[in-house]
Amino acid sequence: MNFLRGVMGGQSAGPQHTEAETIQKLCDRVASSTLLDDRRNAVRALKSLSKKYRLEVGIQAMEHLIHVLQTDRSDSEIIAYALDTLYNIISNDEEEEVEENSTRQSEDLGSQFTEIFIKQPENVTLLLSLLEEFDFHVRWPGVRLLTSLLKQLGPPVQQIILVSPMGVSKLMDLLADSREIIRNDGVLLLQALTRSNGAIQKIVAFENAFERLLDIITEEGNSDGGIVVEDCLILLQNLLKNNNSNQNFFKEGSYIQRMKAWFEVGDENPGWSAQKVTNLHLMLQLVRVLVSPTNPPGATSSCQKAMFQCGLLQQLCTILMATGIPADILTETINTVSEVIRGCQVNQDYFASVNAPSNPPRPAIVVLLMSMVNERQPFVLRCAVLYCFQCFLYKNEKGQGEIVATLLPSTIDATGNSVSAGQLLCGGLFSTDSLSNWCAAVALAHALQGNATQKEQLLRVQLATSIGNPPVSLLQQCTNILSQGSKIQTRVGLLMLLCTWLSNCPIAVTHFLHNSANVPFLTGQIAENLGEEEQLVQGLCALLLGISIYFNDNSLENYTKEKLKQLIEKRIGKENYIEKLGFISKHELYSRASQKPQPNFPSPEYMIFDHEFTKLVKELEGVITKAIYKSSEEDKKEEEVKKTLEQHDNIVTHYKNMIREQDLQLEELKQQVSTLKCQNEQLQTAVTQQASQIQQHKDQYNLLKVQLGKDNHHQGSHSDGAQVNGIQPEEISRLREEIEELRSHQVLLQSQLAEKDTVIENLRSSQVSGMSEQALATCSPRDAEQVAELKQELSALKSQLCSQSLEITRLQTENSELQQRAETLAKSVPVEGESELVTAAKTTDVEGRLSALLQETKELKNEIKALSEERTAIQKQLDSSNSTIAILQTEKDKLYLEVTDSKKEQDDLLVLLADQDQKILSLKSKLKDLGHPVEEEDESGDQEDDDDELDDGDRDQDI
């Protein structure tokens, strides 16, 4: 606090002692009073004094006010008074009408109090927590106070909010507040928060800020809205400008499409309010932020395409050609359209097709050029039209060809009813207005930029100077105007046009040198010692002469490279020439023009350099300097290298064209494949639908069939009793035949099983007898597992056969029972003479038994069917066992061969071991004879190892 008193010592005589004492007493009440009402009244009194006695209240009461915010959060009224008091202390808004000499002091005072407040970061965190309160009297003063802190000391407050947990998210909730004043002040708060802080900008953008802000703009009426729309647009600019991540997020979120509604300006609009002009101006600037030339090329291109696809470019062109548009809006619209079409072929083609609503219709380019060469139009508008024309021709060879074609004799309209772009450019080039000369020269230079074909085509242009005189070429007319000594702006424009025209075009250089007056004029301009105003012209003349040397193909004997360099050395001097050449890049307006493509000048006098021309100077200044100092031999070598490079470039171009054609073919084939895939998918879906329909029809058919069978069964139930004696014996006989077949098949299966058992036993015996103990030791566990599996399969087959035999026996018994029942039924048929009642009773009994027999017959049929299926399965298992036995036989043969080989190898090893032992014994005896001690333990150890190996082998044999 003493620091503030020292800094603001000039105000020490400020209030009377009674006021200072009052403030001190109020602070004491806030600090020491136990009653909430007393503290509340004291804070309210401090609030009323804080505007007039800002310094004293700030020095004495700030700590107490912060303490109130910490301890009295339950009382919204005292919190509101405390926040308002802090706002009055920190904010400079109330000092706007104060005299200028005290304004700076008040600003310093606000920043110093802000520094004291944020010295403890917990104070900002406390303020963020208060913003979560929904109470209007707490939330709104908190928003105002935090906004004031950000305005006073933005970066440190931003850093505190950034590291605070959910700090930015809490502030984003303000945009969803239903109370407009809080929402609107929340927008202002976010403006201050996002200024020059990329990290916070990203967080705010990913907190759905774009969606909320665009909704607010739509609710407020787009461009017809009030100052809230302006604030939202400024916040959107903060989020998007120089922030590639947010720009990509804005494009990917399809928010560009929502911008189209902003520019739907109807002709029925009675007038343009100042707020509407401001809003539309900011909207156009926001579009330019997305397509700025300083953005990454990929991001700019994608935004340009999105703007064309959603109709935003079309809407901007509608405003461009509309009537009654304010001049500043029209100028900004031209600049916006310029950057939307810059370098985008699709957008440039669309812009070329736009016509002005005139009779007859004229292309928009022609109408704009008419404004550019008209000296009565505003300077800013003419600059905007030039920028639009430059952007239309940027990387647009098609557009360049169309503009140059309007200058050629074959395309000029003989009737003179329509004015072409070429005629307007020529008219501006040779006008008496120096600004028109400069603009037309720069525009024509952009029609030639990087396009050697159009440079050659422009050499064909002939101009009729006066009646009776022969036509003069455009190139010659430009040099004639240069030699006449016109204004500096005109000469600079023509020299820039000639430098652009002659660079990278040896044919144009030859045409230029063919006029014998051009070289002496250039050398004379360079050699003279003129004032500072003419130094720029001298530098441009030096550049033009250097281009004539560097791109010279030596087709003219009098003006070869070597002769021109000798001429420079004689007339000018190499050092003097290089010094004059450096005048261009040292000019103060050169660096300004090289920064941005847009020709943005405060007045016509500053309109000297073009952005693209500065690039050309950077490219050629160094190579021209080297070319001046090169010898003829080095020039020859360089020409050979150039020819080789040209040949290489031609080959590369040829292959590029081939690759391009192949790419087109691939694209066509891919499209065909995609169409065929679509057709295939459609056919597959159709087939699936048809299959489902067929299945439905089948199900319906089966259902109808079952229903029909039930009906037939009910109809034939009355006649079944009469056919018992005829049908039942047939069924029984058929069952007997099936049982006999099952018996015979069972016998056959048992015989086959017996044969398989004998085969397996033979294999086992042969395997046991044929394999030695070593073979058994080397036999893989996999073979043993296969044998075990075969045994299990055989046992399973046997058990299945036993179960089948039991089933057959059961069926035989059931068959005999059926026969007995049939005989009893035959005996129980009624005899003549019995009473009708007895006959009816017996008939009923017979019908019941008959239905039971029929049911049992069906069950027998099902069982027989199951037995037949089991028989088939057993047959398959037998076949698989046969194949397994064959495989085992082959494996046994292989094992037998391996055992034989291993026996031979073991015999050989035994022989080798015996020889080795003999050698070892002889060596040991020799060592003993020589007197060396020999340990006998090794032999015993070896012998023990051998014994262990033999024991292990015996165990393996036992296994």
Swiss-Prot record:
Gene3D superfamilies tied to this protein: Leucine-rich Repeat Variant (1.25.10.10)
Q: What is stated about domains?
A: Composed of a globular head, an elongated tail (coiled-coil) and a highly acidic C-terminal domain.
Q: Name one GO cellular component term.
A: endoplasmic reticulum
Q: How does it assemble?
A: Homodimer. Dimerizes by parallel association of the tails, resulting in an elongated structure with two globular head domains side by side, and a long rod-like tail structure. Interacts with MIF. Interacts with GM130/GOLGA2; interaction is disrupted upon phosphorylation of GM130/GOLGA2 by CDK1 at the onset of mitosis.
Protein name, per record: General vesicular transport factor p115
Coiled coil region boundaries: 638-930
Q: Where is the composition biased (Acidic residues)?
A: 935-959
Instruction: State any GO BP term from the record.
Output: Golgi vesicle docking
Q: What is the lineage of its organism?
A: Eukaryota, Metazoa, Chordata, Craniata, Vertebrata
Membrane topology according to the record: Peripheral membrane protein
**Superkingdom per UniProt:** Eukaryota
Spell out the residue ranges making up region: Globular head: 1-637
State the similarity comment. Belongs to the VDP/USO1/EDE1 family.
